[in-house]
């Protein structure tokens, strides 16, 4: 059944493109400094997400972040097609997707990419990420203590086998840029040493409680645009990624106080901070008022330098998306995934 994309959007809610900050990639291409994520965490229907994508495009979003692992690319493809019928050009959009861990074998990469393109009803992607730097997978509903018998530590040679297929995809015109994701500096330095086509983006967890300042500055020094997932601290993340020591980002006193001062939600403070810092955040929401206020926030009432400094103090190096389900037998801690032990 076709998805009903009927919605009433006041013209005053539409945000002009020239008001939205842009990021210039090393290729010279421009990418919006703010986008919409599409990971539903099994809490919303694929149709709800597709309607949010269509609504977001109608009000001014142009960066849409997808992934095959989210299992909703066919529905999102319908939303993108509808937006084009509405008069929003493909060239104005920046659509990204990601290659899942079980498709890293060289013979699987291009066919998987072509399936994503078919599902999204596109001829090319603006960027294609390697979702995780491992071929490790997990069973549906896996818990913290579960270990897949085939999981292994990072292997650079295997990663580069996959990466070289993305380089071929650039040559074929199927993708415009290569993205890395869930990486560390140690791993990325090896990729930069061996890559024929440099990655243009790196997607990573970033929010005020986990700002990753050293890695962030390293990426910028290498001409790689940091893209922030979970920019609000992922309050709806899976239980397997929760620990008692986790810090709820939106409840941080400094964030709450700044939000009160500006008359906005703490989530909007996080979005403003991310964009003003130089990131490209991709918060997810199916709720119109939320994704509208997020985009509108980056066009007005910026945080002061003093407020940005206050938010810097919130950083507790608290990683929330730990990836425990990708650990291998014998691994002592999720930190092994991040080269921290």
Labelled PLM ranges:
Residues 101, 132-341:
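Beta/alpha (TIM)-barrel catalytic core signal, keyed to glycine-rich beta->alpha loops juxtaposed to Asp/Glu
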Residues 94-107, 129-135:
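Structural motif corresponding to the early beta-alpha repeats
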Residues 2-93, 110, 232-235, 336-341:
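N-terminal binding-site loop/beta-alpha segment at the start of enzyme catalytic domains
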Residues 62, 123-126, 176, 200:
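Short acidic/polar active-site loop segments enriched in Thr and Asp
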Residues 109-130, 168-172:
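CE4/NodB-like, metal-dependent polysaccharide N-deacetylase domain
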Residues 24-26, 77-90, 117-122, 192-195, ...:
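Acidic (Asp/Glu)-rich catalytic clusters
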Residues 43-57, 105-120, 161, 186-189:
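Short, acidic/polar
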Residues 34-47, 98-107, 150-157:
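Active-site mouth loops of central-metabolism enzymes
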């Amino acid at each position: 059944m076709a998805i009903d994309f009927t919605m009433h959007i006041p013209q005053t809610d539409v945000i002009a493109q020239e008001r939205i900050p842009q990021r210039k990639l090393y290729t010279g291409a421009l990418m919006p400094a703010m986008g919409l994520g599409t990971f539903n965490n099994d809490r919303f229907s694929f149709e709800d997400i597709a309607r949010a994508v269509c609504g977001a495009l109608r009000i001014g979003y142009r960066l849409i972040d997808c992934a095959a692992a989210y299992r909703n690319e066919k529905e999102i493809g319908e939303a993108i097609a509808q937006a084009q019928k509405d008069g929003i050009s493909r060239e104005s959009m920046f659509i990204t997707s990601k290659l899942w861990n079980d498709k890293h074998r060289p013979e699987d990469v291009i066919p998987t990419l072509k399936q994503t393109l078919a599902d999204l009803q596109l001829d090319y992607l603006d960027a294609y990420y390697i979702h995780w730097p491992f071929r490790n997978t997990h069973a549906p509903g896996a818990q913290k203590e579960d270990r897949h018998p085939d999981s292994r530590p990072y292997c650079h040679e295997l990663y580069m086998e996959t990466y070289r297929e993305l380089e071929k995809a650039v040559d074929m015109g199927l993708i415009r840029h290569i993205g890395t994701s869930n990486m560390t500096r140690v791993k990325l330095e090896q990729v930069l040493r061996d890559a024929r086509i440099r990655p243009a983006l790196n997607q990573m967890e970033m929010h005020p409680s986990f700002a990753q300042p050293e890695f962030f500055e390293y990426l910028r020094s290498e001409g790689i645009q940091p893209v922030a997932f979970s920019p609000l601290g992922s309050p709806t993340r899976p239980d397997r990624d929760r620990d008692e020591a986790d810090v709820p980002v939106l409840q941080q006193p400094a964030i709450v106080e700044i939000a009160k001062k500006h008359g906005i939600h703490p989530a909007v403070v996080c979005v403003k901070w991310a964009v003003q810092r130089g990131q490209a955040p991709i918060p997810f929401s199916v709720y119109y008022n939320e994704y509208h206020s997020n985009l509108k926030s980056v066009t007005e009432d910026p945080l002061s330098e003093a407020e940005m400094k206050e938010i810097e103090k919130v950083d507790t190096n608290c990683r929330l998306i730990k990836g425990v389900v990708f650990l291998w037998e014998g691994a002592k801690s999720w930190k092994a995934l991040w080269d921290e032990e």
